[in-house]
């Protein structure tokens, strides 16, 4: 046995030293962060080996010895696949599956008789250190920009670890094992809920973390190792939990695995949700067999059970109607795909925003009905009921989050105006001057490229174009004043103002950020902001200014002080000193080219945090930027929605949901949430900010 342990330790040390040699070949931040992750895995592996050894040593159970030896063989096979056959995916899959399985064994094998053993204490410390290192590694990876977020529900490693943990529960009786398998499914739903950034995902996570150790495992009456259970929970939840803040994916990007799924799969998911809801209702009805509190249970279940049924009929009709409208959007999307119309733009044109805003209120009532019915029919000794309840909560939370986020990001109209002044030289008084003839052709090509890029940007995101002014001699103040005021006064064909106004400028600027215009005139940020206040008034439109100039930082700093308008400035910062042997000196247009490519090509490989960039991105937003919301549906919209999708018998509940939604019952929570969002935007500005219009603001 000691030989096996020595072999395991020596193999792990060999792996670590091999990794260290690879890191020494190319020492950089990314390899250092990755090495921290390897340390967490090594600590966990040693903890598992020591924990299994202690259990075998104390119980003399040959099953543990067989599993331990088999685990070593599996890890040896994984190492061979990784190092000799370059089958990294297969190797990591085997490791993740066995990590989950062995952690489950540590969790479920009774250790109460030897919990004060010295080696068992060391195992506990190793498990705790693994939690700390894993969490720290995940945090550092995201702070350093080493993680490239991609649309997914569950990663392969998370899925395999969950499967391994569920398989480990089969060492118990069937009913207890089934309860734990359903609990693992609930944890998978919560991971997806967090990754989708659902509005109630954190609250659902807190409920899960509170109920599981205190009530669920107590209902099963089984001894559980809290250290192994905590290690499994924190290691698997740390990445999706941190991604709630660090993920820069837009709403449609996060929900891509569902929104872009085939029609049959989406319909099947709705039917599956309906079956899960029905199973929950059946288990809740088992409470009627408790005659001890019949005078409370029977009336309570009768009232809230009927309320739950009506709410969930509306819930399923809403999901079915959403998929019907989504199918229509996919038909249009497949027809107009060559025109670069994204799916979210098509959904906006099909009226999905109003549908989602109304549906959000109805789904919230369904979630509230589930919580009430769960409380009324609570069964503290039934692990199956608790696990199914914990599955239903994140499912309904995801539906609420989908409608909430789509309702907030879809439907915004936008209009853009671009000014391209291809002058690089200025007179001492600040007036732009024409370039020498030998540079004209080169500059014209570069300026035309900038013009084409910004036109591509407008077309790709279905931004209505007011105009793209290209002037080699510069624009005077009066001309620019007239054009900008006309642009800022534009409205949609239906009458209201556009939701977002985008101004793009590239050309010469002074060190203070002022635009250098013809005749020695300038345009200051305060002047443009005053024009915007004059035209926007009490409306809730946004202004986004994109600058490709040598001195955009002053405007980026000034916009942070704006407290009464929704304004954002995206600028560029050019390196002052560049090694010509390593990279070309930065020029105007380089930022535009990269920024447009980043926002128009989802398969781009642009890394804004890359070390040694000659052109860096900077942006800032005004103080109330995070408070921005689109217009809400009116009572007439709700009535039309009800008449279109729901039977007449459900109208009272639909009307009640609309009335309660208008009451703003959670105004205090929304105020706190608004304050937290403002704090985040003012003090912890994210590296990537989704504007909700299909493009993003970025900073290096």
From Swiss-Prot:
Membrane-related topology note: Multi-pass membrane protein
Keywords: Glycoprotein, Membrane, Nucleus, Transmembrane, Transmembrane helix
Transmembrane recorded as keyword: yes
Keyword Nucleus assigned: yes
Alphabetized PANTHER family for the sequence: TRANSMEMBRANE PROTEIN 168 (PTHR14437:SF2)
Domain of life of the source: Eukaryota
Protein name in the entry: Transmembrane protein 168
This protein's GO CC annotations: nuclear membrane
Membrane-spanning parts: 36-56, 63-83, 89-109, 171-191, 197-217, 231-251, 268-288, 297-317, 355-375, 383-403
CDD domains the record matches: TMEM168
UniProt record similarity statement: Belongs to the TMEM168 family.
Residues glycosylated per entry: 340, 536, 607
Single annotated GO MF: sodium channel regulator activity
Functional description taken from the UniProt entry: Plays a key role in maintaining the cardiac electrical stability by modulating cell surface expression of SCN5A.
Subcellular location as annotated: Nucleus membrane
């Amino acid at each position: 046995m000691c030989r096996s342990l020595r072999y395991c330790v020596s193999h792990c040390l060999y792996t670590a030293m091999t990794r260290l040699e690879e890191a020494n070949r190319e020492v950089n931040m990314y390899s250092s962060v990755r090495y921290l992750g390897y340390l967490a895995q090594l600590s966990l592996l040693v903890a598992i080996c020591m924990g299994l050894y202690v259990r075998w040593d104390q119980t003399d159970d040959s099953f543990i010895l067989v599993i331990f030896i088999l685990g070593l063989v599996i890890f040896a096979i994984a190492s061979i696949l990784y190092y000799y056959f370059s089958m990294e995916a297969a190797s990591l899959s085997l490791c993740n599956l066995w990590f989950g399985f062995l952690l489950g064994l540590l969790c479920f094998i009774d250790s109460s008789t030897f919990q004060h053993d010295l080696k068992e204490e060391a195992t506990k410390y190793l498990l705790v250190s693994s939690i700390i290192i894993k969490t720290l590694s995940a945090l550092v990876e995201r702070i350093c920009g080493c993680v490239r977020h991609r649309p997914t529900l569950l990663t392969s490693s998370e899925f395999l670890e969950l499967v391994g943990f569920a398989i480990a529960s089969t060492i118990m009786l069937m009913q207890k094992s089934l309860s734990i398998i359903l609990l693992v499914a609930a944890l998978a739903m919560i991971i997806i809920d967090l990754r989708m950034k659902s509005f109630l995902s954190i609250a659902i996570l807190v409920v899960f973390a509170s109920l599981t150790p205190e009530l669920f495992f107590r209902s099963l009456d089984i001894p559980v190792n809290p250290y192994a259970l905590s290690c499994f929970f924190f290691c698997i939840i740390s990445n999706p939990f941190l991604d709630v803040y660090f993920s820069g994916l837009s709403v449609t990007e996060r929900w891509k695995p569902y929104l872009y799924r085939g029609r049959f799969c989406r319909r099947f998911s709705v039917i599956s949700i309906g079956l899960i809801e029905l199973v929950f209702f059946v288990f809740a009805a088992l409470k009627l067999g408790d005659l001890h509190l019949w005078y409370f249970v029977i009336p309570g279940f009768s009232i809230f059970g009927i309320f739950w049924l009506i709410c969930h009929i509306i819930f399923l009709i809403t999901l079915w109607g959403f998929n019907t409208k989504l199918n229509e959007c996919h038909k249009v999307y497949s027809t107009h795909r060559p025109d670069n119309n994204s799916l979210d733009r098509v959904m906006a044109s099909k009226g999905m925003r109003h549908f989602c805003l109304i549906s959000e209120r109805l789904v919230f009532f369904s979630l509230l009905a589930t919580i009430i019915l769960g409380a009324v029919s609570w069964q503290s000794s039934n692990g199956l009921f608790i696990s199914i309840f914990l599955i239903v909560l994140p499912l309904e939370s995801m539906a609420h989050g989908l409608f909430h986020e789509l309702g907030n990001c879809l439907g915004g109209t936008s209009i853009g105006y671009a000014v391209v002044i291809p002058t690089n030289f200025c007179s001492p008084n600040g007036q732009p001057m024409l370039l020498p003839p030998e540079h004209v052709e080169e500059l014209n090509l570069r300026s035309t490229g900038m013009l084409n890029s910004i036109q591509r940007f407008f077309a790709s995101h279905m931004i209505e174009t007011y105009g793209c002014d290209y002037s080699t001699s510069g624009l005077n103040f009066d001309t620019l004043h007239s054009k900008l005021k006309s642009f800022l006064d534009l409205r949609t064909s239906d009458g209201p103002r556009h939701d977002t106004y985008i101004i793009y400028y590239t050309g010469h600027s002074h060190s203070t950020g002022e635009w250098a215009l013809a005749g020695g005139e300038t345009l200051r940020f305060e002047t443009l902001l005053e024009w915007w206040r004059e035209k926007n008034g009490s409306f809730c439109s946004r202004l986004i200014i994109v600058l490709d100039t040598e001195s955009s930082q002053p405007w980026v700093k000034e916009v942070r002080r704006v407290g009464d308008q929704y304004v954002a400035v995206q600028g560029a910062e050019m390196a002052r000193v560049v090694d010509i042997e390593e990279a070309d000196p930065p020029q105007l247009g380089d930022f535009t080219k990269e920024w447009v490519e980043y926002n128009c090509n989802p398969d781009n490989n642009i890394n804004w945090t890359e070390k040694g960039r000659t052109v860096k991105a900077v942006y800032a937003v005004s103080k109330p930027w995070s408070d921005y919301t689109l217009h809400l549906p009116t009572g007439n919209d709700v009535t039309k929605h009800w008449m279109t999708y729901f039977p007449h018998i459900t109208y009272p509940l639909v009307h009640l949901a609309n009335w309660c939604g208008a009451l703003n019952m959670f105004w205090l929570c929304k105020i706190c949430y608004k304050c937290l969002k403002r704090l985040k935007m003012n003090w912890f500005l994210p590296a990537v900010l989704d504007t909700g219009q299909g493009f993003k603001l970025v900073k290096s």
